From Swiss-Prot:
It comes from Xanthomonas axonopodis pv. citri (strain 306). InterPro entries: UPF0761_bac, Virul_fac_BrkB. The chain crosses the membrane at residues 45-65, 102-122, 151-171, 179-199, 213-233, 247-267. GO terms for cellular component: plasma membrane. It is a multi-pass membrane protein. This is UPF0761 membrane protein XAC0937. Belongs to the UPF0761 family. It is found in: Cell inner membrane.
Length: 422
C-alpha cells in the first residue's frame, strides 16, 4: 500500500509528470527504435529456419515432448502469425524434414545467422538501457542457449499441463467449457506478456526491476494486439497485396508483421528503460550544461572511498550517492572510464577501481573523456560536501589560467601579422 500511495503522489506531482513525459519522449527519439526494428526484422527472417531447428531439436531430445511439437507449432502460427503468411509454416516443416540433407557448411551458415540475430537483439536492448559494457562472449553464448532450450521446454511443458488441466471433469460441464474457451483465448496474450517480461529482464546487461518490466511489457502486448487486429482487418477486407505479389505475398506480409512486432517490443523496452533511468531532479540538483567534469570528479571520489573500504559500487548505489547524475550520464562516464581501464566490473556486476588514482594524471581524464572545462561560475549541486569541495577546487585550478587567456580579444592574436596581403 505504501508503494501504491507513493506512485499516486508522484502522479499528482505535475512537475514530476511533465519532466518524465519529456524524458520519455527524448528517449524514444534517441533510441531510434524504428530503424532498430527494421534491422531486427531483416535478420529475424533469416533466423527462422535455424531457430526452428534448435527449438524442435530440443523437443526431440526429450521423448515426452515429441507429441507436442505439432501442437506447439500450430499454437504459434494460429495465434501469432497473420493467416496470409501461414504458408511459411509449410516451408519450415519442409526444411526440418530435409535437415539430414544439409551440408556442414549449410549448418554453419544457419547457426551463424541465428547467433547474429541473437547478438543484434542483445545489442539493441543494451543500447536502449544505455549499457556501458556488454557481457563476455562465453557468458553471452550460455545465456542464448539457456533462453532457447529452457524457453522451448517451458512452452511445451505449459501446453502439456494446460491440456491435462482442461481434460479434468470440471471442464466437461457447460460452465467449464466456457471457462476453458475463455482461457485459451486469453492464453496468447498471457504468453506474449510473460515472454516479453522475461526478455526485458534477461537480455540486457542491466538489472531491470520487475516493476519497470511489467508496464513496458503491458504496453508491448497492447501494441501487438492492435497490430494483430489491424492486420486481420486489412487482410480480411483488402486483397490488393495478393494481386501485386501473387504467390510471394506471404513474404512481405511476414516481414511487415515481424517489423511491427519488433516495434511494439522495442517501444515497451524503451518505456521500461525510461522508468528505471528517470530520476526527478529539482532545479537545485541538476548539473549545469558543460559541468559534466564536476560529476566525473565526484564519481571518482566515490570509487576512491569505496576502495578504501574494499567495496565496489553498483549503478543503483551510484545514483543514490550522486543524485545530480542522470542514468544516461552515469552510463557514459562508466563506459569511458572502463575504456581507459580505470574501472572494471566484477562478477557481481559492481564497478571497482582498476588503477590507483595516485598515478592517474588529470590530463588523461581530460584527453580521453573529452569533457570541457567550463569558464563561467554556476551554482553546483552538493558543492559543500567533501566530494563537492574537492571537485570544485580541482575545477577552479583547471579554469583559472584559462580565464585571462580567453578574455583577450580574438583580434589581438593577429596584431603581429605582416600588413601586406599574400
Amino acid at each position: 500500500m505504501n508503494k501504491l500511495h507513493q506512485w499516486k503522489e508522484r502522479l499528482r506531482d505535475r512537475a514530476r509528470t511533465v519532466s518524465f513525459g519529456r524524458f520519455l519522449w527524448r528517449r524514444f527519439l534517441d533510441d531510434r527504435l524504428f530503424q532498430a526494428a527494421a534491422s531486427l526484422a531483416y535478420t529475424t527472417v533469416f533466423a527462422l529456419v535455424p531457430l526452428a531447428i534448435v527449438v524442435f531439436g530440443v523437443l526431440s531430445a526429450f521423448p515426452a515432448f515429441n507429441e507436442w511439437k505439432d501442437a506447439l507449432t500450430d499454437f504459434i502460427f494460429n495465434n501469432f502469425v497473420p493467416g496470409a503468411a501461414r504458408s511459411v509454416q509449410n516451408y519450415l516443416n519442409r526444411s526440418l524434414e530435409d535437415l539430414g540433407k544439409f551440408t556442414v557448411a549449410g549448418m554453419v551458415a544457419l547457426v551463424a545467422s541465428l547467433l547474429i540475430t541473437l547478438h543484434s537483439i542483445e545489442q539493441t536492448f543494451n543500447s536502449i538501457w544505455r549499457v556501458a559494457a556488454a557481457r563476455p562472449k562465453v557468458t553471452r553464448f550460455l545465456i542464448y542457449w539457456t533462453v532457447l532450450t529452457l524457453g522451448t521446454m517451458l512452452a511445451a511443458a505449459s501446453m502439456a499441463m494446460a491440456a491435462y488441466v482442461f481434460a479434468l471433469p470440471l471442464f466437461r460441464t457447460t460452465e467449464g467449457q466456457w471457462l476453458a474457451e475463455f482461457a485459451w483465448r486469453l492464453a496468447p496474450m498471457a504468453v506474449e506478456f510473460v515472454c516479453i517480461v522475461l526478455i526485458y529482464r534477461v537480455v540486457p546487461q542491466h538489472v531491470v526491476r520487475l516493476r519497470h518490466a511489467l508496464p513496458g511489457a503491458l504496453l508491448a502486448v497492447i501494441l501487438m494486439e492492435i497490430v494483430k487486429w489491424g492486420f486481420g482487418f486489412y487482410l480480411g477486407n483488402f486483397q490488393t497485396y495478393q494481386r501485386i505479389y501473387g504467390a510471394l505475398s506471404a513474404l512481405p506480409i511476414l516481414l511487415l508483421w515481424i517489423y511491427l512486432s519488433w516495434v511494439s517490443v522495442l517501444l515497451g523496452a524503451s518505456l521500461a528503460s525510461s522508468m528505471s533511468a528517470f530520476r526527478y531532479q529539482p532545479e537545485a540538483m541538476r548539473l549545469p550544461p558543460g559541468f559534466e567534469i564536476y560529476g566525473l570528479l565526484r564519481l571518482l571520489g566515490r570509487f576512491s572511498q569505496a576502495r578504501v573500504h574494499g567495496d565496489g559500487l553498483d549503478e543503483d548505489r551510484i545514483l543514490a550517492l550522486e543524485p545530480m547524475l542522470t542514468d544516461t550520464l552515469m552510463q557514459e562516464l562508466l563506459c569511458e572510464l572502463k575504456r581507459i581501464r580505470l574501472l572494471r566490473r566484477d562478477e557481481r556486476g559492481q564497478w571497482l577501481l582498476a588503477r590507483d588514482l595516485d598515478v592517474v594524471p588529470l590530463a588523461e581524464l581530460y584527453e580521453n573523456c573529452q569533457l570541457r572545462v567550463p569558464i563561467e561560475d554556476r551554482p553546483l549541486p552538493c558543492r559543500d560536501d567533501a566530494f563537492g569541495q574537492a571537485a570544485a577546487a580541482a575545477l577552479e585550478q583547471l579554469r583559472q589560467p584559462l580565464r585571462s587567456v580567453l578574455a583577450q580579444p580574438v583580434g589581438d592574436l593577429y596584431t603581429h601579422l605582416p600588413g601586406d596581403p599574400p
